[in-house]
């Protein structure tokens, strides 16, 4: 596990710890080692964990003695949900997922569904900030992004990486839909919004907007990382 990267804003209690972990996922029948970004958002008392893909122990080490209020999965692929129950059970926290990703979720957890069905416009509160759910389908039907206006960030899952929309495998890819989600729902956020993706480095909305036309032209061959 890499050391967590911490982000915050002056005058606010809420901060973001980014935990990079790695694990094996299977893409089209082939096993790959993949790094994922898990985010811990909160203050000294309470947190929300976003995209618990690998290594629950590493994430809980960063959480420490703070209460986990919720575990939010931006979509149902295994590298974004695999550690959800191991993290949630410590504080009996609910797990949240968009219902359109239940079929994908059940490939990893066939017998246990999430507790909360997210919907576009839904809100989660933690510390002195809120997360707004933005339904951003394409990578999967139930992909969501989470906008925190107070901190000026959006957790984009695999809807948008610094290198472009994440390439996808599995049963439900919709690249035109993914581009539509990026253009209509993410690139319309304030230009200085920091995009915190499920893999790799961050990017600003303004920087992503400059690359958008090239992603449209490239189509499914746009350079986003291959992801499960």
Question: Where in the sequence are the language-model features?
Answer:
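Short Gly/Pro-enriched turn/cap motifs at secondary-structure boundaries
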Residues: 29-31, 115, 135-137
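Active-site HxH/HxHxD metal-binding segment of metal-dependent hydrolases
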Residues: 33-34, 47, 54-130, 160, ...
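Conserved S/T- and glycine-rich ATP-binding loop of Class I adenylate-forming
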Residues: 41, 74, 136
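Conserved hydrophobic "DFG−1" position in protein kinase catalytic cores
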Residues: 40-41, 97, 125-126, 146-148, ...
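Metallo-beta-lactamase
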Residues: 47, 130, 135, 141-228
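Conserved beta-strand hairpin/beta-sheet module of binuclear metal-dependent hydrolase folds
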Residues: 11-66, 145-157
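Short polar/acidic secondary-structure junctions
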Residues: 123, 137-138
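C-terminal regulatory/interaction regions
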Residues: 2-6
């Amino acid at each position: 596990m890499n050391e967590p990267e911490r982000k915050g804003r002056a005058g606010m209690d809420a901060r973001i710890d980014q935990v990079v972990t790695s694990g094996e996922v299977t893409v089209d029948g082939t096993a790959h080692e993949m790094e994922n970004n898990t985010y811990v958002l909160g203050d000294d008392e309470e947190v929300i964990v976003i995209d618990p893909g690998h290594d629950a122990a590493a994430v809980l080490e960063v959480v420490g003695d703070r209460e986990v209020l919720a575990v939010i999965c931006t979509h149902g692929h295994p590298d974004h949900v695999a550690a959800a129950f191991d993290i949630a059970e410590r504080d009996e926290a609910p797990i949240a997922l968009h219902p359109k990703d239940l079929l994908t979720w059940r490939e990893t957890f066939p017998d246990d569904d999430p507790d909360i069905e997210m919907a576009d416009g839904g809100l989660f509160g933690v510390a002195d900030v809120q997360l707004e759910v933005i339904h951003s389908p394409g990578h999967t039907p139930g992909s969501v992004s989470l906008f925190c206006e107070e901190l000026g960030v959006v957790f984009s899952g695999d809807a948008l990486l610094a290198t472009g929309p994440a390439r996808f495998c599995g049963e439900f890819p919709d690249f035109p839909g993914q581009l539509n989600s990026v253009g209509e729902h993410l690139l319309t956020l304030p230009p200085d919004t920091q995009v915190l993706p499920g893999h790799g480095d961050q990017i600003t909305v303004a920087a992503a907007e400059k690359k958008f036309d090239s992603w449209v032209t490239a189509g499914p061959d746009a350079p986003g990382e291959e992801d499960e």
